[in-house]
Amino acid sequence: MRRVKEIGGVAYKFVSPSNRGVADRLVVLPQGVVWFVEVKKEGGRLSTLQNIFAAEMVKLQQNISIVWSKEDVDDLIKEMTE
């Protein structure tokens, strides 16, 4: 996620072996802002566990986004910088 670096952040590939369904990327931005980002190809779908994880993060008031296309990435970067 080169675009994250351009806005001063770091994107980590996130793997949690004992917790299937977690987001693909953990994006850390300045001022303590953290995003969980699930990257899907167009036409892909979220698994049941990914949906559960996303709902859990929303319930915990965490930043989470699912990106399906370059346009989604552009929109997310814009949201991250607002």
Where do the PLM segments sit?
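Catalytic phosphate/metal-binding cores of nucleic-acid and nucleotide-processing enzymes, i.e., regions
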Residues: 1-82
